[in-house]
Amino acid sequence: MRLEAIRSVYFVGAGGIGMSALIRYFLSKGKTVAGYDRTSSELTERLITEGAQIHYEEDIDLIPEECKDKASTLVVYTPAVPQGHAELTYFRENGFNIHKRSQVLGIITRSSKGLCVAGTHGKTTTSTMAAHLLHQSHVGCIAFLGGISKNYGTNLLLSATSPYTVIEADEFDRSFHWLSPWMSVITATDPDHLDIYGTKEAYLESFRHYTTLIQPGGALILHKGLEMQADVQPGVTTYTYSRNEGDFHAENIRIGNGEIFIDFVAPDTRINDIQLGVPVSINIENGVAAMALAHLSGATDEEIKQGMASFRGVDRRFDFKLKNDRIVFLSDYAHHPAEIAQSVKSVRELYQDKKITVIFQPHLYTRTRDFYRDFADSLSLSDEVILTEIYPAREQPIPGVTSQLIYDNLRPGIEKCICRKEDVLSLLTQKHTEVLVVLGAGDLDNYAPQITQLLSEKYHG
């Protein structure tokens, strides 16, 4: 596929976070961009104002004429879209050039030095942090991110001069196997997406294969203690990192008064008194990985220090919506048991003497079936759990798999209930809340503005 010959790009599933970064990229190249998504969202409406044509009905008559010339149109789809989708079927039957999102991302980034962040969790924050460190340094970067950077209000960063592209490397559907990393961080390999992989062993094998793709001369930055076996090519340097040990790590950690300061230790330098712009304990580890990437890419110690202090975070990643003396409300994308445990522990560290209420919307029937006991254990670290129905995304219901499975396995004595997401607001009006955490990768976050308004009126302070 020669991208130069493409005049229009059509996206089936335009509202996904990864798809939207590609939409913005092709708009920046002056292409005609159109697409379909199932529902309107703040993101799709933003894309329309930026120049994309997006509709919400599955109807081939709504495909713009410019996108019906198969010689000059590229069709991009996400695996979340059913194979029988009418528009996808139209393009397939008429011989259009059709590629998965991950394939297109691999093609676009092949000619640059890819700085990739892979792993079960932590990759969105780590990659966005690394992109910020480089973008505000003399090195610069292009970046395709899996979340909206609060510093830039977008998930795409551009540079006319930098050789580097920061990429969130997604293991879902083995998407990251299309990439050609120059350097890669691997944050975690807790099994996930077992609907795709089947077994833990197959999941770990997928990460092993991914490490073979790192280019000679580059580097692998591997979290200490992972089960996976790396298999890098000759000429690839392997480093380790973690919060407290490894080639890259933090020392002299100071947490207090809503602030975190650390010293960053690398094999050939030490940067003292770094302030975390988003002072959450998990960002110590994320920050070490991001700083390792930036350091190995040529950012100076002072640029790294300034960038860490000015980092503002990612939408829906430990995202404070409301914070005063009477009420704290934050939203977090955590949707895997290990992520939820980290999230709740980080909240507990900040608010040790307050009651922590978690509202969790489970994401996918298969993930709930595979991990319901682990979800219950992680959620039980809070004081109160409110469960909503499962968000299905791409899946059909599985008999017997509901939020009740998690509910029944929560620790004895914990306050708990199950409710429809539509009833969350009325439930919160009746409850006394001190720290509220909304967790999940589904659509419950769409209620965040209404929850924020309700809580600020109820606990104005």
Predicted regions: what is each one?
Residues M1-K100, V104, A219, H249, ...:
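N-terminal leader/targeting and accessory segments in enzymes
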Residues E50, A376-E434:
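C-terminal helical cap/extension that packs against the catalytic core
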Residues K31-R38, L220-K224, T357-F360, S382-P392:
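Short internal beta-strands
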Residues F11, Y77, V117-G119, V438:
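Hydrophobic Val/Ile/Leu positions in short beta-strands of Rossmann-like dinucleotide-binding domains
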Residues K68-L74, S162-P163, H432-E434:
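Short acidic/histidine-rich motifs immediately flanking catalytic phosphotransfer sites
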Residues Y36-D37, H55-I60, H99-Q103, F144-G146, ...:
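Beta-strand->loop->alpha-helix junctions that form or flank phosphate-binding loops
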Residues R2-S8, G18, Y25, K29, ...:
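Nucleotide phosphate-binding/pyrophosphate-handling subdomain across enzymes
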